[in-house]
From Swiss-Prot:
Gene: rpmG
Protein species of origin: Chlorobium phaeobacteroides (strain BS1)
Identification of the protein by name: Large ribosomal subunit protein bL33
GO molecular function, one term: structural constituent of ribosome
Taxon lineage: Bacteria, Pseudomonadati, Chlorobiota, Chlorobiia, Chlorobiales
Translocase found in the keyword field: no
PANTHER family reported in the protein's UniProt record: 50S RIBOSOMAL PROTEIN L33, CHLOROPLASTIC (PTHR43168), LARGE RIBOSOMAL SUBUNIT PROTEIN BL33C (PTHR43168:SF2)
Keywords, ordered alphabetically: Ribonucleoprotein, Ribosomal protein
Amino acid sequence: MAKKENRIIITLECTEARKEGLTPSRYTTTKNKKNNTERLVLKKYNPNLKKHTEHKEIK
């Protein structure tokens, strides 16, 4: 019997663009839900704002 996979696909969304009412940039990535139980926060590039911003995991 196969084990249940621990890696899940998540979506990261820009928080600064959301506050300003602009179109937020989104990235998809994977995370290990066994090691990282809380929501993921990464600094990624937002092409709409042309700078690196904080991206948070969304449902």
